[in-house]
Amino acid sequence: MDWKKLNVCLADANNELPKPSMLRKSLFKDQRMDDLYREIIVERYKEPLYRGTLDPHDITFEDENPLCGDHIRIDLRISDDNKVTEAAFSGHGCAISQASADLLLESVIGKSLDEIRQMTKQDVLDNLGIDLGPVRLKCALLPLKVLKAGAYGLGEATDDILEE
């Protein structure tokens, strides 16, 4: 899939892309949009843009989902004004967890640590653009859990961090 062409087609007058969930609700009310987002998830799983590690890094944190074995590590480089300048993830897991990590990191470039701390479950779901059951929801939220634990400088991540 040619992401640049897709982005040009979907961008608004301010050259900003709509969140997938808003686009799905406003433009399409059928299976085509779900199919598009499923394709995006598979593509970002197979060819992630932010897979790798950063050395040196300013923040790193990792965690796993013991139920399914997904494992995510996130590295961030932070500017002097506390904004993310680079981000990378590594690990293994299902297509949902890996694509969620890739899409999440794309959304945090340029954000401050305070903005990251304010991110919610809904931000992740908006990035993915599809509805998920409870088991897949844990897979999708693992990258956010890891990211927020790193932003808060915690020693370990708990599910409570997703409620903050």
Regions found by a protein language model. Name each.
Residues D2-G52, K111-D114, M119-E164:
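C-terminal binding/interaction regions
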Residues E43-E86:
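Structured beta-strand/loop patches that form or line metal/cofactor-binding pockets in enzymes
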Residues F61-E62, T85-G93, D126-R136:
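A short glycine/serine-rich beta->alpha loop
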Residues C68, G91-A99:
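Short, thiol/selenol-centered motifs that function as redox-active sites or metal-ligating centers
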Residues R77-S79, S90, I109:
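Solvent-exposed residues in well-ordered beta-strands and their adjoining turns
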Residues I96-S100, C139-L142:
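Catalytic-loop motifs flanking and including active-site residues across diverse enzymes
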Residues S100-K111:
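Alpha-helical support elements that line or immediately flank enzyme active sites
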